[in-house]
Amino acid sequence: MSILFHAYPLARPALFAMDAETAHEVTLAQLQRAYDCGLTRKLLHAQPEAPATLMGLSLRNPVGLAAGLDKNGAHIDALGNLGFGFVEVGTVTPRAQPGNPKPRMFRLPRANALINRLGFNNQGLDAFIANVQRSQWRSQGGILGLNIGKNADTPIERAAEDYLIGLAGVYPHADYVTVNISSPNTKNLRALQGGDELSALLGQLQERRLALADQHQRHVPLAVKIAPDLSDDQIDAIAEILPRHGIDGVIATNTTLARDAVQGLPHAEEAGGVSGAPVHELSLRVIERLRSRLGDAVAIIGVGGILSGRQASEKMAAGAQAVQLYTGLIYRGPALVGECVRALAQGSR
């Protein structure tokens, strides 16, 4: 365990000298190699006991991997064995697509932040499912979330068609499914968070889920991932709509378009969503507002700007039942997983 944890701080300067997306790919490849050699397989069982329940699912611990780090589901086992209680992969679209032109990911180290405009680059649903089927994570007791989106060239008026295809495709292989309607990098996607649009989409997804549950003889929870840049009225509308359509969870939040916290820094004016430290307070506001409106009707997963165990605890105190990590892993490395698990285990005593 110590070898891996000490290796990342040593490797970080070399990784940060690379283009951010290249470094991301190199890190995943090296992590996969470490897993294949057996170097990470003890980490999963080295975490303290912190069992939790989320959307009716039993978790080893309430610290998860956020979608986006493994878009094609090619590294589920390697990532899960870093000690996560659950892993979410994607976003996957029905058809493969290249995403936006490169460069499309930028570090802002002084702010512990990233800007990305990746644009749902992925290999498509068939390749995604094949990768998921090869994974041993679920057979080892891990919880797997599969995150679905729409293709960039699908008109927003027909977005539901893509989500219905995605839901049907991933349903047999998922412990839960996340509907991503909050990426700022797919044109007009965030419009689906609006009251009428959201209600129409979720109504169709719930109808399809009921049919799939009957077909596969199992209920798979549905979660919706929302943006941090919502007004109080928009949050309230979402909180009213989710339980009406039987939605089990809400993931708060995706990246922000706000630039206040990074103004004047190199790359700050690049188009795309900001993740990392600047999102922490924004997501806390959304989580607190959702919890005050939802009560216990819908589970909340807190994500955005967690770079310490203390910040994971703050997400839970705001009303989340679980948390997810992404950008914090880039700045802190895999040691962050255990730090968050320990903090939440202590907080639950």
UniProtKB/Swiss-Prot annotation:
PROSITE patterns (alphabetical): DHODEHASE_1, DHODEHASE_2
Pathway: Pyrimidine metabolism; UMP biosynthesis via de novo pathway; orotate from (S)-dihydroorotate (quinone route): step 1/1
UniProt-listed Pfam families: DHO_dh
One annotated GO molecular function: dihydroorotate dehydrogenase (quinone) activity
Domain of life: Bacteria
EC code: 1.3.5.2
Major localization class: membrane
Binding-site residues, substrate: 71, 116-120, 180, 185, 254-255
Cofactor remark from the record: Binds 1 FMN per subunit.
Cross-referenced InterPro entries: Aldolase_TIM, DHO_dehydrogenase, Dihydroorotate_DH_1_2, Dihydroorotate_DH_2, Dihydroorotate_DH_cat, Dihydroorotate_DH_CS
Gene Ontology biological process: 'de novo' pyrimidine nucleobase biosynthetic process; 'de novo' UMP biosynthetic process
Topology within the bilayer: Peripheral membrane protein
Gene Ontology cellular component annotations, sorted alphabetically: cytoplasm; plasma membrane
Reaction(s) the record says it catalyses: (S)-dihydroorotate + a quinone = orotate + a quinol
Positions of FMN binding: 67-71, 91, 147, 180, 225, 253, 276, 305, 326-327
Keywords linked to the UniProt accession: Cell membrane, Flavoprotein, FMN, Membrane, Oxidoreductase, Pyrimidine biosynthesis
Cofactor(s) named in the record: FMN
Subcellular location field: Cell membrane
Keyword Oxidoreductase found: yes
Active site: 183
Family: Belongs to the dihydroorotate dehydrogenase family. Type 2 subfamily.
Subunit note: Monomer.
NCBIfam families: PRK05286.1-1 (NF003644), PRK05286.1-2 (NF003645), PRK05286.1-4 (NF003646), PRK05286.2-5 (NF003652), pyrD_sub2 (TIGR01036)
Function: Catalyzes the conversion of dihydroorotate to orotate with quinone as electron acceptor.
Protein name: Dihydroorotate dehydrogenase (quinone)
